[in-house]
């Protein structure tokens, strides 16, 4: 037993080193060397070993990122050195004045600056003791911040242990939400009738102040760290060298910074980034300029509010005035009615803008938006066009107040507003708009990725009665497509090939494509990898679901409700019969013998060495099948602690009952 325990300990330590190495490759170097599936395999193996040997669990284990308990609140914690805000510069003149002040304090000395991107997020502080992450906090008022350690640990870009055992290090940076995650989050909130986040910064701040860390974990946040706040021991001599050292420690820094020898170089570098800021996958609202020499920083010192050795250059907000030509309603795949303003086209943030979402009736009323109004338009977080305000003083008397329809503009059914939600919804489950938007979502790039099946052809197929739901797509024939507008022989053949190819997509893609409320792309992948098959997910209990990291009660309830409906069960059955993949393939270094091929298992009770999902995965990897109920077709019932009625039924039917020890032996058979 001692040898076995030592082997487990050695394997756990090796797995942690390997997982941390891959985190460093992915988040710090941006050079991943393994697939997501291979990474998940390593994590699952580590989880299994730690469940069997809880004495081996350590605070810095990659498995400890998402805590299970909901917090009651956040306590205040002091910063060792105040987290001061920066003074602002709004033009070239302000930058040159900053340079003049710096040089007046350092007469005759060479001054170099480091210029960095100003990430539009939430300022955070991380404490490491002997290389281990022990605390994470917000900036707060600069003197006191909020302890949000449990939420910051869910961000995979933050290392739980550094590559070197530094006695004490406080490092400061910015937590942010990528643009694509912000768009998906707001789309999901809009469909759910929840208030929208105004920009990625607010979304990041709101996500980090969640009392339930599972919600934070599902929000796909990231970080860039940009400075040493406090350190026990010697600092590198310059800010640029500090950034390089932080990177060596495994801390993620932004690579797009530059050392400049003059204020002219600073201004040139800022101009370059002002022109290409919209190409970034995250929002920036300016640039930060710092004196490079830490010794010079020390002599320059600070005022009561901000350091003398740094300044933030703020990009001007890109806004434009347009006319609201009309307000139209779009019905989404969950029945939400979303008003959209049709605008006179204007140039904004590098694109032509002709539409702006108005989100819901409340926002239209709050801003008193009318058809015909002159409106100030900007892009929220440089992404989504929005109306900031209208100009009542410019009204001519011909403007028309907008009234949300009481019936669905697509099907004529009653529209209701659910208590506690901002959204109005169509009450018709068979609304044609819901079907259309559901199919468009199903074929989208992040879901089943069926190239060539755009909104136009989907509308034609629906109008022609050929397609009512996603399963109908797999019944389409060449003759059906060639008759559609703008569909020639070649495009019809290519589309049929794309539909056929989509049958081999991952289970995660299919789950996301089904459009289950609150189940985003990330949650779909997690569910697919955890359960391994559609059948297993459909049989999952609420307890099974909420026991998964990043799956909270709201998602669990939505999944249970979706699979309880007969029409959805029928849709999945038809997709399966059409040949659509219902399994999540796991990449394995060695092929597993199919020793359980054709055998049906039921697992009941609590197993010591396996979670329910792990036991199921082990059976399915060997060719077996797992059922949620005992019948005459069941071959084995695996019994853990507190098994319940399934154990009794198995005895009555004379089915072979396996203890956990028996089950392990069966799995080990060659």
Curated annotation (Swiss-Prot):
Belongs to the NAD-dependent DNA ligase family. LigA subfamily. The gene is ligA. Pfam families: BRCT (PF00533), DNA_ligase_aden (PF01653), DNA_ligase_OB (PF03120), DNA_ligase_ZBD (PF03119), HHH_2 (PF12826), Nlig-Ia (PF22745). NAD(+) binds at residues 36-40, 85-86, 116, 139, 174, 290, 314. Residues 591-670 form the BRCT domain. It comes from Desulforamulus reducens (strain ATCC BAA-1160 / DSM 100696 / MI-1) (Desulfotomaculum reducens). Gene3D superfamilies: 5' to 3' exonuclease, C-terminal subdomain, 6.20.10.30, BRCT domain, DNA ligase/mRNA capping enzyme, Helix hairpin bin, Nucleic acid-binding proteins. This is DNA ligase. Transmembrane segments: none annotated. Its EC number is 6.5.1.2. CDD domains: BRCT_DNA_ligase_like, LIGANc.
